[in-house]
Design a protein with these regions (language model features):
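Catalytic, metal-anchored helix/loop core of enzyme active sites in primary metabolism
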Residues: 1-254
Length: 254
């Protein structure tokens, strides 16, 4: 971000939620007018389930996302809500806001891609079909808006829009990501490295669903956080987190 500032460059995000926020902020000349950013998520394939039921879910279950078609790793991240936690960190960095001003809401229909609430009480939202061609095309043609091959949103035949509070007890990865965001420094690198290694084990069907969050939490508790790190220290934290997950897995299966 500092390099973009130095060069006078504008970062146009491609991720659908951050693209939505970027679009909602067009015309906002003073970021102090923002009360909070609201990132939406579908809730994944296990939305509405309790811990016992979620704990029995398998790789095949986790890969059945209700609204989006994605690769296996990010689909698992959506099922644990880790993907939304990483997007919270991304939003904090992109828009330079503290965690207290970045919220998450479960929105099962995946039509509202994110919102911005302003201090005067107004809330701006960006709506569209759940199709990545929309934010990608917007980023490529910005500031113009060209024709898009994605189907347009049919509001008259769309389902009612609903919003729910995320369940951080059933989906602890969201809480772990928020805690890493608050901790700062290399905490986010530790979180990400540990999660990637844990999801790799889950996709290999070597661990269960809740082992993902348990292994990530173990790595966060084991690997020391460095504030204002160098690139080398960030890479070292990532490596240490992955090794911590491998070691924890080996101990459990020795």
């Amino acid at each position: 971000m500092s390099e973009a500032d130095r060069c006078g460059a504008e970062i146009v995000p491609v991720d659908s939620e951050h693209s939505a926020i970027f679009q909602c902020l067009q015309g906002c000349v003073d970021r102090r007018e923002i009360r909070r950013l609201i990132l939406t998520c579908s809730g994944g394939p296990f939305r509405g389930m309790g811990r016992d039921e979620v704990g029995r879910m398998t790789k095949a279950d986790a890969l059945r996302h209700p609204n989006w078609t994605m690769g296996p790793k990010i689909t698992v991240d959506c099922s644990t809500l880790m993907n939304k936690g990483l997007e919270v960190i991304e939003a904090m960095r992109l828009y330079r806001l503290p965690l207290a001003q970045v919220s998450v809401m479960v929105h099962p229909q995946s039509i509202v891609h994110s919102m911005v609430e302003f201090k005067d009480g107004a809330v701006l939202a960006q709506l569209g079909t759940p199709d990545m061609r929309l934010p990608i095309r917007y980023a490529m043609t910005y500031p113009a808006r060209g024709e898009n091959p994605a189907p347009p949103l049919d509001l008259l035949n769309s389902p009612p829009l609903t919003f729910l509070e995320p369940d951080r007890e059933t989906f602890p990865c969201l809480r772990l990501a928020e805690e890493a965001a608050e901790a700062g420094g290399t905490a986010c690198a530790i979180l990400n490295g540990a999660n990637e290694e844990a999801v790799r084990l889950f996709l290999a069907e070597k661990i269960g669903f809740y082992d993902i969050s348990d292994l990530v939490a173990a790595a966060r508790a084991t690997v020391l956080v460095t504030q204002t790190p160098s690139l080398e220290e960030i890479l070292s934290a990532d490596h240490a987190a992955r090794e911590a997950v491998k070691s924890a897995f080996a101990r459990r299966h020795s």
